[in-house]
């Protein structure tokens, strides 16, 4: 079946879902969780086949890591489904209401977006995470995953269909599209049938979707995130923040990719942070000034880390989203240069300053144009769960409709209900 036909079916199914109660939608999520549990063996086996094919094709290690969906990760996905069911219903919000002088009663009520398309790469868990968020908010969803996860996504889609069928809802509410480039092109062209498209993946995928899609796009994800160590920073605190921002999960979009350090504290800070980063397996790409400091202060650590552990940074490094244990390091003259660097190379995701100077922190927080800005905390907190929103569909780096972690509320819009008694204008 072609994508436009699948989108038409999704539109019809969504109209049916829109009439259901919160309790009915939650029952559907619980049925999906049970179906995933019942089919866990088939899902994990399908994922093993995807992993074997990926290794044979020589895909990069970080991509293979993102592709993996073993028993433990699948159990986490299932817990996530049940956690979404426990979240407050985004449509059951008390409407804003007012009465006009002519007697018209106007209400602004929350409604689903409609049909949501998701284009994503190697993470099969996104198939379920995205689907249940969309369903909870009253939307149908079309899921276009990467070809490297085709078997996993198909198995997950079959389980979700079984869950929907169990509670009497249309299986067309959550459809896994073919993993072909043609399917992606058809989805991006389905403007009258798909209400919004959300790409989740690397910079290339997001850029291609934004440039080619005729469907409105919410741009997510690309995270060239910076941690700036100001001259008034607590250096021990800064060291722990940098280690967490880079090393706790380097393959995600809220991980730090560039470290900026004020010249006044560069030598003592890099003397402590450099060896700690190298010990954690991080490769450093440093400006000339940082390189000289690292080569002098971290010489014993460099001897054990290998020749590629610290190298001169290139222009490409400042704009790189490594998604790996690699960090660009630059010494700056002060706050002005740090702000200019972030304005030039940042992607509007998450930016952090470490400082004890309230004035410098305030200027940084006001000046940096990003979805999330931090003072004395790791960029790794840019996450729906960490912000208290529950699960998220992605992290928006644009300004219209949604910005930052996108929870259930961001999968809705509103309409006006106007109640009259014969008024004319």
Swiss-Prot record:
Enzyme superclass (EC) = oxidoreductase
Q: Does the keyword Oxidoreductase apply?
A: yes
Belongs to which family?
A: Belongs to the gamma-glutamyl phosphate reductase family.
Q: Name one GO biological process term.
A: L-proline biosynthetic process
Task performed by this protein: Catalyzes the NADPH-dependent reduction of L-glutamate 5-phosphate into L-glutamate 5-semialdehyde and phosphate. The product spontaneously undergoes cyclization to form 1-pyrroline-5-carboxylate.
Extract the HAMAP family matched here.
ProA
**Which PANTHER family did the record assign?**
DELTA-1-PYRROLINE-5-CARBOXYLATE SYNTHASE (PTHR11063:SF8), GLUTAMATE SEMIALDEHYDE DEHYDROGENASE (PTHR11063)
Q: Which domain of life is it from?
A: Bacteria
Name of this protein: Gamma-glutamyl phosphate reductase
Q: Which InterPro entries match?
A: Ald_DH/histidinol_DH, Ald_DH_C, Ald_DH_N, Aldehyde_DH_dom, G-glutamylP_reductase_CS, Glu-5-SA_DH, GPR_dom
Give the matching Pfam families: Aldedh
Q: Look up the signal peptide feature and give its range.
A: none
**SUPFAM superfamilies listed in its UniProt record:** ALDH-like
User: What terms describe the molecular function in GO for this protein?
Assistant: glutamate-5-semialdehyde dehydrogenase activity; NADP binding
- Where is it mostly found? cytoplasm
Which pathway does it serve? Amino-acid biosynthesis; L-proline biosynthesis; L-glutamate 5-semialdehyde from L-glutamate: step 2/2
Reactions mediated catalytically? L-glutamate 5-semialdehyde + phosphate + NADP(+) = L-glutamyl 5-phosphate + NADPH + H(+)
- Tell me which GO cellular component terms the UniProt record holds: cytoplasm
Q: Which UniProt keywords apply?
A: Amino-acid biosynthesis, Cytoplasm, NADP, Oxidoreductase, Proline biosynthesis
Q: What is its EC number?
A: 1.2.1.41
- The coiled-coil regions, if any, are none
Subcellular location(s) of the protein = Cytoplasm
